[in-house]
């Protein structure tokens, strides 16, 4: 993330605004940024999970713990049982995509994902439009939502999306 962007977030926060970046990146990728940046929360994985400063679900804000460190809480749009079932299904879909679509690979940040899967199409790999469309078709045929970002094809179960995540938190 460019330093000018991080500074802009800090300036907004210093001006008294609630700052909540929204990303398609995984929650695992977001943890160091949520801890270091002057933000109230980060919504990750296309709106399904939030890292909230302060450790209290109903409160947004950077609130230190008694020892002075900032505490992060993970909040999810889906309950634990639903997330676990969806995660298992999504891993099967990801394996199918890698098997059936030539050149398809899981994104390098897949390890930190809890509520979606991501197939790389332009970050480190290059998939032509026909193969991107095939990945989307497979995800949708498995009942998943699918979206194509500038670098990944993301798939997930549930009705959430980035705008929904912004409104939720």
Residue ranges and their predicted role:
Residues 92-169:
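Conserved acidic, metal-coordinating active-site core of Asp-based
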